[in-house]
Regions:
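Carboxylate-rich, polar loop motifs that coordinate divalent cations or form catalytic acidic clusters
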Residues: 1-428
Length: 428
């Protein structure tokens, strides 16, 4: 660590914010927080010579593990109880191109790699079978529904597979050419949200949302389509949609370049689909309008991965952004590479590993800190080196070029401190 004191330490001090300060001969002063880090980082080592640190997908299983797709490196897993990484879990060469999505049941993992789905036995950690969608196209997402059927999205439409007599068989295929009322808005589909309570699937795409409503037998009754409309104020910000999560009756949807969308469906008596939407992005404090992964926490607030990691306060309707100095694995987070566990911890994968954390009720935590003056300059020269002990300053005419320096003397996440000031009897 280039910022740490190396040797010949001559003084140690613990300040009011639990920062430990260490001074050393000819080595300056170093400080570090002694508090537990809010963001915990797990670094990923490449699983092969051509491997990558990049986490391409994440999936939490009720067995207490987060299963992780490692680009060019198969599947690894993280024990959420012991907070330990187990690598490798399954690094069969068939998984090496790129794991795009993972699902699981009590006995198996289902892992999509390009154009195939591989079935891994949990106990032996070996691939026991595989199958391919009829379209033989690149797979973007797979999801198990209430009936333990596997839905697959590609750029050639939507397919559904069911296990029969030990074999996974195609039972449904839907495209933009399927007759109504089961026609999709487009063949180019991205991520699937399975709403088990309402027995329906909501799928993001390059042409808005497709909402599949199922009956009690699991048959698709209709597909409702929702698209952006530039003529209305409460519209989706874009039709090019990716990550999706839900809280109560509200869907939170990430876009590539058009921010975060809040979507509520309206079920009209005549069956016509409608919705209301609001969108948020850079104007509300986001670091970017690319929202590549979305997770709603236990308090109803939304965490977004993309360019760094952002927290969206749904009450204030503002973003708070976090970066490397907050302990993140890097500046880049993967597309839909996130999940949440049974305890409410959130996991976000990126270019060098992943971060996990337990959201709090209020983030960031507000605190009133006293500002201390530290230096005063007049025409570029230090005039009063002991300004912190001075109650008043007199600036004689015509000196009108001066600078005042101040600090809170708090080193607890100083990168997130914000200051406000006003001139009395001048500023309103």
């Amino acid at each position: 660590n280039p910022y740490s004191a190396r040797n010949h330490i001559n003084s140690v001090f613990l300040d009011k914010d639990s920062n430990l300060w260490v001074s050393a001969w000819s080595n300056g002063v170093s400080y570090s927080s002694t508090r537990d880090a809010f963001f915990k980082t797990v670094w990923i080592k490449p699983q092969s010579k051509v491997g990558s640190e990049f986490v391409s997908t994440m999936h939490y299983d009720p067995d207490g593990y987060v299963y992780i797709g490692n680009k060019f490196g198969g599947v690894i897993r993280f024990d959420t109880r012991k907070q330990q990484l187990e690598e490798p879990y399954c690094n069969a060469p068939e998984l090496s191109p790129n794991v795009t999505s993972i699902q699981s049941d009590s006995q198996h993992l289902y892992v999509s790699v390009r154009e195939r789905v591989f079935v891994i036995d949990k106990q032996s950690r070996r691939i026991i079978s595989s199958f391919q969608p009829q379209c033989k196209d690149y797979i973007f997402d797979i999801k198990l529904d209430t009936f333990q059927r596997l839905w697959i999205t590609t750029y050639s439409g939507l397919e559904c597979f069911e296990e029969r007599n030990g074999q996974w068989q195609n039972i449904y295929a839907f495209t933009e050419a399927t007759p109504e009322p089961r026609r999709l808005s487009t063949n180019k589909l991205h991520k699937i949200y399975v709403d088990k309570a309402k027995n329906e699937l909501v799928i993001t795409s390059v042409m808005g949302l497709n909402r599949l409503q199922l009956n009690a037998k699991g048959e698709v009754v209709r597909v409702l389509k929702y698209a952006a409309d530039t003529q209305t104020s409460h519209s989706l910000s874009s039709n090019y949609l990716w990550a999706i999560d839900k809280d109560k009756d509200t869907y939170w949807i990430g876009t590539m370049g058009s921010g975060l969308n809040k979507v509520i469906f309206t079920d009209n008596a005549n069956g016509t689909p409608s919705y209301t939407a609001e969108h948020y992005g850079i104007d509300e404090g986001a670091t970017s309008n690319d929202i590549e992964s979305v997770e709603v926490d236990a308090f109803g607030n939304v965490w977004c991965g993309g360019f760094y990691l952002s927290f969206f306060d749904t009450k204030l309707k503002r973003f708070a952004a976090f970066n490397n100095s907050d302990g993140l694995q890097g500046h880049s987070f993967g597309t839909a590479s996130s999940c949440k566990d049974a305890e409410g911890n959130l996991y976000f994968g990126g270019s060098h590993g992943f971060n996990y954390f337990k959201p709090q009720a209020q983030i960031p935590v507000s605190a009133k800190l006293k500002a201390h003056f530290s230096r005063f300059e007049n025409n570029g020269k230090v005039v009063n080196s002991a300004i912190e002990f001075t109650n008043t300053l007199t600036i004689a005419y015509p000196n009108n070029n001066f600078s005042v320096y101040f600090t809170t003397l708090s080193y607890k996440a100083p990168q997130h401190l914000r200051y406000r000031y006003k001139l009395e009897d001048y500023d309103t």
